[in-house]
């Protein structure tokens, strides 16, 4: 599904309709507003996450009803703002690892999702360079433990922040949920895509359940979901 938002008011309306997060977590964010970067909860960021969850939920129900993922990995997880809304829609997920090269971001992600960290690591942050991981057989250290895991689902909403090394280590049976954008002016955007065709060529999937774009007044975000 594609979206073409002409104004930020339209983006806000979409977020209000589709982004679901408990009031208690919003309260935590407000009370700790000096901890979390405000742009992590901008209209554009929330819209992209709402779009991801909306499409993934539909695909899970309509296309993959027999699939029950146990383990997820979120690459470039930043402060973990996707985690709670994801669990709201997919409560059956046993464990999600948020991976980011920035230790401060991982610390903030665990603070934001503390109840899930304390719940047998339903969420656990990992400080690591995603391009040093082999995603079909991940090995990393977190919380004093050496973890080896092959995640069922791999989410990367930060493709513009990294090269494609990570993509080459994904196996054919791992569901990929990928986002990128065409905005070159933001700091750290080293691998943007000019259009949907370029996005498709960079991240080819053999089985594709959706591929689309969300146009906002500032930039266009691209997303695809499927298997290599």
Enumerate the predicted regions with their spans:
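A short SAM/SAH-binding and catalytic strip from SAM-dependent methyltransferases
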Residues: 143, 148-165, 182
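Conserved SAM/SAH-binding beta-strand->alpha-helix loop
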Residues: 101-104
């Amino acid at each position: 599904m594609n979206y073409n938002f002409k104004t930020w008011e339209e983006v806000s309306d979409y977020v209000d309709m589709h982004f679901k997060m408990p009031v208690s977590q919003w309260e935590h964010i407000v009370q700790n507003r000096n901890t979390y970067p405000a742009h992590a909860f901008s209209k554009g960021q929330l819209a992209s996450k709402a779009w991801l969850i909306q499409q993934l939920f539909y695909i899970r129900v309509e296309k993959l009803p027999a699939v029950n993922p146990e383990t997820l990995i979120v690459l470039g997880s930043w402060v973990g703002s996707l985690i709670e809304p994801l669990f709201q829609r997919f409560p059956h997920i046993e464990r999600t690892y948020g991976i980011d090269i920035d230790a401060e971001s991982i610390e903030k992600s665990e603070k934001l999702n503390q109840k899930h960290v304390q719940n047998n690591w339903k969420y656990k942050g990992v400080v690591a360079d995603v391009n040093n991981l082999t995603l079909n057989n991940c090995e990393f250290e977190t919380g004093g433990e050496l973890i080896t895991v092959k995640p069922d689902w791999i989410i990367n909403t930060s493709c513009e922040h990294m090269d494609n090394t990570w993509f080459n280590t994904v196996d054919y049976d791992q569901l990929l949920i990928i986002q990128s954008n065409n905005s070159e002016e933001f700091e750290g955007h080293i691998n943007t895509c000019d259009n949907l065709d370029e996005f498709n060529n960079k991240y080819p999937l053999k089985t594709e359940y959706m591929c689309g774009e969300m146009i906002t007044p500032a930039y266009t975000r691209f997303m695809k979901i499927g298997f290599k």
